[in-house]
């Protein structure tokens, strides 16, 4: 079975950190991108943090979003353009 390439937005938040912890234990998932609005040049699980962008999401099959409502709309615009699936966990809409 092929692995699911996963991008996690808001990766430094409580839910983002939990998603990373769970994903690295799951053999069916490969984290290909971690995004955060701040703390660039930081590395988590061997992956450098990026800002939300086409480059960050290009290799992902699925984007899991745990950011803010404003940021979620940004993620959705990029995901739509790239035809990526998105799981939204953001609250506060």
Q: What is each stretch, according to the model?
A:
Residues 61-93:
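Glycine/small-residue-rich loop that forms an oxyanion/phosphate-binding "nest" at active or ligand-binding sites
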Residues 12, 35-38, 92:
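Residues in the short beta-alpha loop(s) of Rossmann-like NAD(P)-binding domains
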Residues 2-6:
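Extreme N-terminal starter segment of soluble prokaryotic enzymes
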Residues 46-60:
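Short acidic low-complexity segments
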Residues 8-21:
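N-terminal Rossmann NAD(P)H-binding glycine-rich loop of SDR-like oxidoreductase domains
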Residues 22-45:
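NAD(P)-binding Rossmann-fold cofactor-contacting core
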Residues 16, 41-45, 59:
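A glycine-biased structural micro-motif
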